[in-house]
Protein backbone atom coordinates (compact mmCIF):
# COMPACT_ATOMS: atom_id res chain seq x y z
CA UNK A 1 0.00 0.00 0.00
CA UNK A 2 2.81 2.41 0.90
CA UNK A 3 4.49 1.64 -2.43
CA UNK A 4 1.35 2.74 -4.30
CA UNK A 5 1.13 5.97 -2.29
CA UNK A 6 4.79 6.78 -3.01
CA UNK A 7 4.34 5.89 -6.68
CA UNK A 8 1.24 8.09 -6.89
CA UNK A 9 3.08 10.97 -5.21
CA UNK A 10 5.98 10.64 -7.64
CA UNK A 11 3.66 10.60 -10.67
CA UNK A 12 1.82 13.67 -9.37
CA UNK A 13 5.12 15.56 -8.95
CA UNK A 14 6.24 14.64 -12.46
CA UNK A 15 2.93 15.75 -13.97
CA UNK A 16 2.98 19.02 -12.02
CA UNK A 17 6.60 19.65 -13.09
CA UNK A 18 5.81 18.95 -16.75
CA UNK A 19 2.79 21.27 -16.64
CA UNK A 20 4.82 24.01 -14.91
CA UNK A 21 7.66 23.69 -17.42
CA UNK A 22 5.27 24.00 -20.37
CA UNK A 23 3.71 27.20 -19.04
CA UNK A 24 7.05 28.58 -17.79
CA UNK A 25 8.48 28.68 -21.30
CA UNK A 26 5.25 29.77 -22.98
CA UNK A 27 6.64 32.09 -25.66
CA UNK A 28 4.50 33.93 -28.18
CA UNK A 29 3.71 32.07 -31.38
CA UNK A 30 4.72 34.93 -33.66
CA UNK A 31 8.30 36.12 -33.27
CA UNK A 32 7.26 39.49 -34.74
CA UNK A 33 5.09 40.20 -31.71
CA UNK A 34 7.92 40.15 -29.16
CA UNK A 35 10.56 42.80 -28.47
CA UNK A 36 13.50 42.77 -26.13
CA UNK A 37 16.13 45.23 -24.95
CA UNK A 38 18.83 45.52 -27.61
CA UNK A 39 22.36 44.30 -27.02
CA UNK A 40 24.88 47.09 -26.26
CA UNK A 41 26.72 46.46 -29.55
CA UNK A 42 23.47 47.03 -31.49
CA UNK A 43 22.96 50.58 -30.14
CA UNK A 44 24.25 53.50 -32.24
CA UNK A 45 25.15 56.92 -30.84
CA UNK A 46 24.59 59.96 -33.05
CA UNK A 47 25.51 63.09 -31.05
CA UNK A 48 23.95 61.82 -27.84
CA UNK A 49 20.87 60.30 -29.47
CA UNK A 50 21.09 56.55 -28.99
CA UNK A 51 19.06 54.31 -31.29
CA UNK A 52 18.62 50.65 -32.10
CA UNK A 53 16.33 48.93 -34.55
CA UNK A 54 13.42 46.93 -33.19
CA UNK A 55 12.14 43.61 -34.55
CA UNK A 56 8.76 45.06 -35.48
CA UNK A 57 8.56 47.67 -38.22
CA UNK A 58 7.33 51.09 -37.15
CA UNK A 59 9.05 51.04 -33.74
CA UNK A 60 12.63 51.67 -32.56
CA UNK A 61 14.57 51.84 -29.31
CA UNK A 62 15.50 55.46 -28.55
CA UNK A 63 17.23 57.34 -25.73
CA UNK A 64 19.00 60.68 -25.26
CA UNK A 65 21.92 61.64 -23.03
CA UNK A 66 22.94 65.31 -23.23
CA UNK A 67 26.67 65.78 -23.75
CA UNK A 68 27.32 62.14 -24.61
CA UNK A 69 28.27 62.62 -28.26
CA UNK A 70 31.37 60.42 -28.04
CA UNK A 71 30.31 57.92 -25.38
CA UNK A 72 29.69 54.27 -26.14
CA UNK A 73 27.28 51.80 -24.60
CA UNK A 74 29.37 49.31 -22.66
CA UNK A 75 26.95 47.21 -20.59
CA UNK A 76 23.27 46.34 -20.15
CA UNK A 77 22.15 46.81 -16.53
CA UNK A 78 18.42 46.09 -16.37
CA UNK A 79 14.99 46.66 -17.86
CA UNK A 80 12.07 48.08 -15.91
CA UNK A 81 8.45 47.13 -16.66
CA UNK A 82 5.47 48.86 -15.03
CA UNK A 83 2.32 46.77 -14.66
CA UNK A 84 -0.91 48.59 -15.45
CA UNK A 85 -3.13 45.51 -15.36
CA UNK A 86 -1.62 42.44 -13.73
CA UNK A 87 -4.92 40.56 -13.96
CA UNK A 88 -4.81 40.46 -17.76
CA UNK A 89 -1.61 38.68 -18.82
CA UNK A 90 0.64 41.13 -16.89
CA UNK A 91 -0.06 44.12 -19.14
CA UNK A 92 1.90 47.34 -18.87
CA UNK A 93 4.82 49.10 -20.53
CA UNK A 94 8.61 49.14 -20.50
CA UNK A 95 9.74 52.16 -18.52
CA UNK A 96 13.23 51.73 -19.91
CA UNK A 97 16.18 49.51 -20.73
CA UNK A 98 19.09 50.86 -18.66
CA UNK A 99 22.70 50.72 -19.90
CA UNK A 100 26.09 51.95 -18.65
CA UNK A 101 28.01 54.35 -20.89
CA UNK A 102 31.78 54.60 -21.28
CA UNK A 103 31.79 57.99 -19.49
CA UNK A 104 30.22 56.53 -16.34
CA UNK A 105 26.69 57.77 -16.98
CA UNK A 106 23.53 55.80 -17.66
CA UNK A 107 21.29 55.54 -20.71
CA UNK A 108 17.62 54.62 -20.66
CA UNK A 109 16.15 53.38 -23.94
CA UNK A 110 12.40 53.33 -24.57
CA UNK A 111 10.43 51.68 -27.32
CA UNK A 112 9.15 54.50 -29.53
CA UNK A 113 6.57 54.20 -32.27
CA UNK A 114 7.03 56.06 -35.56
CA UNK A 115 3.39 57.17 -35.50
CA UNK A 116 3.61 58.26 -31.84
CA UNK A 117 1.07 55.79 -30.45
CA UNK A 118 1.73 53.80 -27.31
CA UNK A 119 1.76 50.00 -27.55
CA UNK A 120 0.10 47.77 -24.99
CA UNK A 121 2.74 45.31 -23.79
CA UNK A 122 2.79 42.17 -21.73
CA UNK A 123 5.54 40.20 -20.02
CA UNK A 124 3.46 37.07 -20.57
CA UNK A 125 5.23 34.03 -19.18
CA UNK A 126 8.79 35.20 -19.86
CA UNK A 127 10.78 33.90 -16.87
CA UNK A 128 13.34 36.74 -16.60
CA UNK A 129 10.89 39.32 -15.22
CA UNK A 130 10.74 39.54 -11.40
CA UNK A 131 9.30 41.98 -8.88
CA UNK A 132 11.89 44.73 -8.45
CA UNK A 133 13.70 45.02 -5.15
CA UNK A 134 14.66 48.65 -5.94
CA UNK A 135 11.08 49.93 -5.72
CA UNK A 136 8.41 49.48 -3.08
CA UNK A 137 5.68 48.33 -5.42
CA UNK A 138 4.70 44.88 -6.71
CA UNK A 139 3.61 46.66 -9.91
CA UNK A 140 7.23 47.28 -10.95
CA UNK A 141 9.11 44.37 -12.50
CA UNK A 142 12.73 44.22 -13.53
CA UNK A 143 14.89 42.01 -15.67
CA UNK A 144 18.66 41.98 -15.39
CA UNK A 145 19.49 38.81 -17.32
CA UNK A 146 22.27 39.39 -19.84
CA UNK A 147 21.54 36.92 -22.64
CA UNK A 148 19.91 37.90 -25.95
CA UNK A 149 16.11 38.28 -25.78
CA UNK A 150 16.11 37.72 -22.00
CA UNK A 151 14.07 40.83 -21.24
CA UNK A 152 11.34 40.23 -23.81
CA UNK A 153 7.85 41.69 -23.89
CA UNK A 154 4.92 40.96 -26.15
CA UNK A 155 3.53 43.86 -28.15
CA UNK A 156 -0.24 43.67 -28.49
Can you annotate each of these PLM segments?
Residues 6-16:
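Bacterial N-terminal signal peptides
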Amino acid sequence: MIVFIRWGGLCAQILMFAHAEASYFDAPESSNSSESCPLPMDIENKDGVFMSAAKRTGVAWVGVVVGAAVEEVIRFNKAIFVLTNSAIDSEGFISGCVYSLSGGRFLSLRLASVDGREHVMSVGAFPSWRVSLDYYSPAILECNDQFRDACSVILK
